[in-house]
Amino acid sequence: MNSSFQSRILVTGGAGFVGSCLAQGLANNPDNLVIIVDNLLTGSENKLPITPYNNVRFIKADVNDFNDISSIFHAFSFDYVFHYAALVGVKRTLANPVMVLNDLNGIRNILSLSKNSGVKRVYYSSSSEVYGEPVEFPQNEHTTPLNSRLPYAIVKNVGEAYLRSYYQEYGLNFTIFRFFNTYGPKQSADFVMSKFLNSAMNNQDITIYGDGSQTRTFCYIDDNIDACLNAFYNDLLVNDVANIGNDYELTILDLARKIIEVTNSESKIVFLPALKEGDMTRRCPDITVMKQLLQRKT
């Protein structure tokens, strides 16, 4: 193996949407050796980075299985870890709560192995879901209470607590990214933005749960990756947390109407019964920290 790499970086979940885009950003730097681990449950090898530098390795493995992931840590001396592996998607996580809770094993495995192998910092993909049904607008990283109820949100919340605990007890540095809705070309078809776009471009009905008054904000993947890479390369957000999203709030109904308009679609909007749980009424992050990462004022 080339010993000239300045940083050896593990990206778990690196065959997923956000993880693969992050891995591509890291692999664009020839000084980085990027090791991607994914169990391909929802990820795809088609999303893996393309690079001329021969600095990417893909290993199919499950971070929730200690034997799987420990052998990878022993084979590489990682400098940094981006732990992005997780079961995602509202309907998928609601339907598989035990599988979601198993992701706690992966968090423990990553932190234990990182602590014992000299990893300098662990970067963790948390979620806006930790805020639950928010009690403050916009949601601020340090003042808005976390209100997690569903297994996915609880796992992300507990994951954050693990990171803080490993720093407090063992000095393992961390950075937490709380991702709000993110969209882009590699996104799976079962997320709201890509689902609406696919329906509109095929003149199929666009289905909305409830009356569509629930709000979300949508962050383009490039902004997400730029913010995270700036934190990494500039050594920012050490032992801290940042919302990664957009602060333009939009109802799901308005999103559907806008997509129909810009695609010149003949799609009709069809309303389905509201989800019993998991569909929060509002989401809007305070992105002051993210704007600082991107060196933007607006």
Task: Explain the meaning of each model-derived region.
Residues 1-182:
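N-terminal Rossmann-like NAD(P)+-binding domain of SDR-like oxidoreductases, especially those catalyzing
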Residues 22, 228-232, 256-259:
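Hydrophobic "lid"/C-terminal helical patch
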Residues 64, 95, 102-105, 150, ...:
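Residue-level signal for the nucleotide or nucleotide-sugar donor/cofactor binding architecture
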Residues 68, 109-113, 218, 223-226, ...:
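Conserved mid-core alpha-helix of short-chain dehydrogenase/reductase
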Residues 157, 182-195, 202-204, 209, ...:
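Glycine/proline-rich active-site loop of Rossmann-fold NAD(P)-dependent oxidoreductases
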Residues 158, 162, 166, 196, ...:
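Hydrophobic alpha-helix immediately C-terminal to the catalytic Tyr-X-X-X-Lys motif of short-chain
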Residues 211, 239-242, 250-257, 264-282, ...:
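C-terminal "lid/loop" region of Rossmann-like NAD(P)-dependent oxidoreductases
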Residues 286-298:
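C-terminal amphipathic/interface module of NAD(P)-dependent oxidoreductases
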